[in-house]
């Protein structure tokens, strides 16, 4: 019985450890308002490759123009402060090399060293680990800061505009006649441009869909961990109640067997989902770093503390699943063994009683002679 209580404590400890580890998924958000951030991956822009130098110089001028446009049409700004707001530190700078993004499943945090007024902030992101969503929402956030409007609304609006443009472009390319006419005007020497654009948009749509699905797998993983903990507590309570009341095991066989089977399946599902999520983070980091084409690399990404936390939790979930399969055994086998032990004990008690009767019948010290014993047996 002592071993059974120790197994209860170990299973509960592992289940609580798995459950509490899921709290790291809800950091790096503005709604949670937590002092820590445990990102799945961290990225920043590079300025030491030929591609990044050309791209960022062009993008910087474009965003500076948009920033000036936003400031000029903001009627709430005092004209005496307009010159100070033209300072480069107040302009949109999402592609600055000193910016560092900490991306998590439900939000991201940004650290920008060149901005003294707002060098760190966190934003909710409902699109999971989608790096495109992070950049577009951050662009909307900075437009909201410049125009002194609600930054969350502007971030969401920019993302909606992006999705609308992608959907419209998809519908446009589905019409081969109109799509070919436009692309021939832009690139008359490339007859395969139509198919290339379709492939690019298809990859973008797949990328968005995969990130949304993986975000919901994180939610499902949290729910499964909670169910595992509740079923484990219920299973332990049923075992203790059975020990106290000494009720027949057959009455509890079906319930206990069902709990054992469900908990086993949930533990395996938890470990499998976590493993798939880790593979996605590793693949995403590999794709962002663009290891194959170093000259085209404009972003450098690395695993964050949340990713390492996921890897550690995967091994904990794996051990928990093994312990569930080892200790949460169905009660049919246990009841059969208990019944066999009870029957063998009853047979041994009966044989011992017969031996004592024969011994007392043949023992002179008991006051009974052998003749009396013979007459008693007859």
From Swiss-Prot:
For bias type Acidic residues, the affected ranges are 347-357
Quote the subcellular location field of this record.
Answer: Prospore membrane
The superkingdom listed in its UniProt entry is: Eukaryota
Q: State the GO CC annotations.
A: prospore membrane
Membrane-spanning regions, if any? 6-26, 218-238, 268-288, 303-323
Question: What is the topology of this protein in the membrane according to its UniProt annotation?
Answer: Multi-pass membrane protein
GO biological-process terms attached to the record: sporulation resulting in formation of a cellular spore
Q: Indicate yes or no for the key word Lyase.
A: no
Task: Tell me, in one coarse class, where this protein mainly resides.
Answer: membrane
Q: Which UniProt keywords apply?
A: Membrane, Sporulation, Transmembrane, Transmembrane helix
Q: Which residues form the signal peptide?
A: none
The residues on the Cytoplasmic side of the membrane are 1-5, 239-267, 324-378
- Where do the segments described as Disordered lie? 344-365
Ranges per topology, Lumenal: 27-217, 289-302
Q: What does this protein do?
A: Involved in spore and ascus formation. Required for the efficient assembly of the precursors of the prospore membrane to a continuous prospore membrane.
Q: Which family, according to the similarity comment?
A: Belongs to the SMA2 family.
Q: What is this protein called?
A: Spore membrane assembly protein 2
Query: Which organism's genome codes for this protein?
Result: Kluyveromyces lactis (strain ATCC 8585 / CBS 2359 / DSM 70799 / NBRC 1267 / NRRL Y-1140 / WM37) (Yeast)
Gene name as annotated: SMA2
